[in-house]
């Protein structure tokens, strides 16, 4: 079954797009069908047809997407539940929304930590302590190295190996600063978060 990376609700006797999950369309694991460049679909639009077949409750919204995963699929959408003024759009559904929904959860957590800490704390989720976990850590930790502390989230971690690399990075000690005459002072080591850290497990 092909999936659109979206939540739906029933309104005015039609399926309406309640939420569109965004991703990174250059990354095959985070491709989001409805947020790709040039796809003119918005939250609040109605999904009226799939490959020329009308879609309306009580039919299951996914029933018309059988066999469409990773295949060009024609959908008809409109801002109203009417065919008048609707538009046909070619999209490519994904086989799984897991990574899109997980990314949304991560980003919601990161924004919440940022808001509640007044921008002082970083948030890093680790899916495991294997290659994907190291990738997540490096990407999120160093992108927030200007923070005063960090929340490391180990919930739903799938296991792996002893995370000595991550432990070493978290345990880095601030040794000093470089004071530049015409620039921003930098730390030594250059990269790191040197303040308090907490882990959610």
Predicted regions and their residues:
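Short, small-residue-rich loop/turn micro-motifs
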Residues: 10-12, 19-24
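Accessory interdomain/linker segments of ATP-dependent helicases and helicase-like nucleic-acid enzymes
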Residues: 1-15
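Structural motif
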Residues: 42-48
């Amino acid at each position: 079954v092909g999936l659109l990376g979206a939540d739906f609700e029933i309104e005015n006797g039609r399926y309406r797009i309640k939420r569109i999950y965004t991703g990174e369309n250059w990354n095959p694991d985070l491709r989001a069908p409805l947020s790709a460049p040039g796809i003119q679909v918005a939250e609040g639009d109605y999904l009226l047809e799939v490959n020329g077949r009308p879609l309306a409750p009580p039919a299951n919204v996914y029933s018309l997407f059988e066999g469409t995963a990773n295949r060009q699929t024609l959908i008809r959408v409109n801002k109203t539940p009417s065919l008048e003024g609707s538009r046909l759009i070619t999209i490519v559904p994904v086989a799984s929304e897991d990574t899109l929904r997980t990314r949304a959860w991560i980003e919601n957590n990161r924004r919440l930590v940022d808001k509640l800490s007044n921008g002082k704390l970083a948030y890093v989720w680790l899916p495991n302590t294997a290659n994907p976990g190291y990738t997540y850590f490096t990407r999120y930790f160093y992108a927030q190295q200007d923070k005063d502390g960090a929340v490391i989230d180990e919930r739903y971690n799938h296991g792996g190996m002893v995370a000595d690399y991550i432990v070493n990075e978290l345990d880095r000690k601030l040794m000093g600063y470089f004071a530049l005459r015409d620039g921003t002072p930098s730390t030594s080591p250059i990269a790191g978060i040197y303040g308090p850290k907490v882990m959610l497990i």
